[in-house]
Amino acid sequence: MAAAIISELQVKGKYGKYGGQYVPEVLMPALEELEEGYERYKNDPEFLAELDHYLRDFAGRETPLYLARNLSKKYGTKIYLKREDLVHGGAHKLNNAIGQALLAKYMGKTRLIAETGAGQHGTATAMAGANLGFETVVYMGAKDVKRQQMNAYRMELMGTEVKPVKTGSKTLKDAINEAFRDWVTNIGNTHYLIGSVVGPHPYPMIVRDFQSVIGREVKEQAMEKEGRLPDTIIACAGGGSNAMGTFYPFIEDRDVRLIAVEAGGKALRCTEKAALHSASLCAGEEGILHGARTKVLQDKNGQILESESVSAGLDYSGVGPELASLAESGRVTARYVTDDEAVEAFNELSRLEGIIPALESSHALAYLKKAAESGELGEFVVVNLSGRGDKDLETVLSLKRGI
């Protein structure tokens, strides 16, 4: 399961013109230490055997590739769901969290810090930290703590200290900023467990590699169930970890269409100080955010705009540099759906299949309707169901009540 991990970059830390290490000099030793540790252990048989054990017996892998018969009937094609919602904790986030936590253990670290938006990555970090015996601190935007109170409590229940961030937009972007500040102060004993394919090298590579278990499983399961690879694979994209994890094993399979669906929020436009969406691939510009050159939402002066989405996990002003490069090259197609369309898809899957999806995953599901109309689906489609939706029930209920 945890096959030997091979990571290739054209230039160290670069994906075409994106990526790199745009960080203060004080962080360079920590990034170099992390890269050296990862290169040392990523193909180590003992490390891989232990990672395989945790993925199988703790996380519950492999996850099913489920034929959604009622959804398939509605859209006139075979639609399979990759059930990452069934991973321990309710989302794909544990794939990366357990991988990085185990790496930190092998590197001799005793403390984990992380950022979180929807709370899924924070929860996954809390789970991994508790299981592997780490002191764990999670930074979470105060706005996100309010809309994801249950996840904040779950983290605290597992011994994690949750620190609300009350600066800026009080969301994921600001939580990442605070986590970096913590890391600078505590580099000696602390590993910063970034939750998406963002940040300075080597993070986008490491997170992608640990999440690629999704795509590797899809590849094997597709051959078992249909005898061939899918025509189309759809995944939501905020920072992009579930999308990259699903897409990466298929990059060289040019007949497989890869579609990343972003959060279109209220509308694909911006005010003077904020975007009304979180669609960096569709509407962003080249810039630097959290240590990497990528596509970001920014104003005419290059200042980062606050993003907006009904989904806390997609509410981010940038995107992973490798995903930005793949979208720019045309290998990945970037699309977006609005808040309303995502909520409609949330309700639709719940009614048709008895599966309540996360609002993040609902963005990928919502694009099925548009893709069917545009002829992008083909005869065999896989949608990555990146998480379950119990965390979002209060949000959807509030929208229904008009609160």
From Swiss-Prot:
Keywords: Amino-acid biosynthesis, Aromatic amino acid biosynthesis, Lyase, Pyridoxal phosphate, Tryptophan biosynthesis. GO terms for molecular function: tryptophan synthase activity. Pathway: Amino-acid biosynthesis; L-tryptophan biosynthesis; L-tryptophan from chorismate: step 5/5. Belongs to the TrpB family. The modification N6-(pyridoxal phosphate)lysine is found at K93. The keyword Lyase applies. It comes from Methanosarcina mazei (strain ATCC BAA-159 / DSM 3647 / Goe1 / Go1 / JCM 11833 / OCM 88) (Methanosarcina frisia). It is an enzyme of class 4 (lyase). PANTHER family: TRYPTOPHAN SYNTHASE, TRYPTOPHAN SYNTHASE-RELATED. GO terms for cellular component: cytoplasm. Its cofactor is pyridoxal 5'-phosphate. It catalyses: (1S,2R)-1-C-(indol-3-yl)glycerol 3-phosphate + L-serine = D-glyceraldehyde 3-phosphate + L-tryptophan + H2O. Tetramer of two alpha and two beta chains. Pfam families: PALP (PF00291). HAMAP family: Trp_synth_beta. Its EC number is 4.2.1.20. PROSITE patterns: TRP_SYNTHASE_BETA. The beta subunit is responsible for the synthesis of L-tryptophan from indole and L-serine. This is Tryptophan synthase beta chain 1.
